[in-house]
Amino acid sequence: ASGEIFGHDTRISLHLLEITPALKALEGVVMEIEDCAFPLVDEVVITDRAEEAFDGVNWALLVGSKPRGKGMERGDLIRENGPIFVGQGKALGKAAEDVRILVVGNPANTNCLIAMHQAEKEGIPRERFAAMTRLDQNRAQAQLAQKAGVEVGDVTNVTIWGNHSATQYPDAENARINGRPVPEVVGDMGWLRGEFIDTVQQRGAAVIAARGLSSAASAANAALDHVMSMEGTTPEGDWFSAAVPSDGSYGIEEGLVFSFPVRIDGQGGCGIVQGVELGDFALEKIAATTAELQEEKAVVAELLK
């Protein structure tokens, strides 16, 4: 809405989808958007109908999902949210021909897989879909910057491999700080393979423990970072993380929504970076997160027919 992502000459029509009982509260959100006086916002549409919300959209951010309740197993959460993303995947058939979709609602990778499967039936290519692991990347960059005593912007080539969950593998060994390998700069492989990984994997839980609610501002910021990266051109030599449908790269099952290092070519194409070196430690971590994603896929198998 401010012009920072799509440019200062691009007008914005914002469509907000909410469940019926929460539409009144959504009116308050619209008031706040109006009070921001964004010069590029032409209209704000609020609705509880997915078909209306997705009608003609160029970007769809699927943020809503049922949160995990006390005593609820991850498999139960997946089953609860699956039907939501079946409906949204079908409704995306109303979107613009060039629509891109970012799934934020958890469990993001598998929700993305479900929506992608349904949307493909509506003629939307799977390559338009991604689940968000940019928040995990941002968390990893911040931890590395603090450890090395540098600016966050000095940290590049950070990769999140796999699932947006506690099994994800935050890869610092292929990352760089001011062009130098992170292990060389940090000089502490024990920390990089231990506390660093644990901190990034458990950061969401730590936020909940501290504030009683899940990440909000940082997640919104990461979603904007993702869209901005997708709309731009990736700087030479760098990459960013996104969970995209696998093309078989790195031995990951084709079609599984898996976080890889990716690059944007400036023509709208998103490609998985090839040739990233992975040692035994990394491969073990990647195998664990792959197994979890395959288990999640099995839970929702009926929704993928």
Q: What are these model-predicted stretches?
A:
Residues 121-130, 136-305:
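C-terminal substrate-binding/catalytic lobe of Rossmann-fold NAD(P)-dependent dehydrogenases
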Residues 4-57, 298-302:
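Conserved N-terminal Rossmann-fold NAD(P) cofactor-binding segment
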Residues 25, 84, 222:
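Charged catalytic carboxylate motif
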Residues 10-15, 41-45, 99-100, 126-129, ...:
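Residue-level recognition of the N-termini of beta-strands and the immediately preceding loop/turn
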Residues 1-4, 268:
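Canonical Rossmann dinucleotide-binding motif of NAD(H)/NADP(H)-dependent dehydrogenases/reductases
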Residues 73-142:
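Rossmann-like NAD(P)(H) cofactor-binding subdomain of soluble oxidoreductases
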Residues 61-62, 103:
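Redox-cofactor binding/interface segments in oxidoreductases and associated redox assembly factors
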Residues 30-59, 65-96:
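A structured beta-alpha segment of the ubiquitous adenosine-cofactor-binding alpha/beta core
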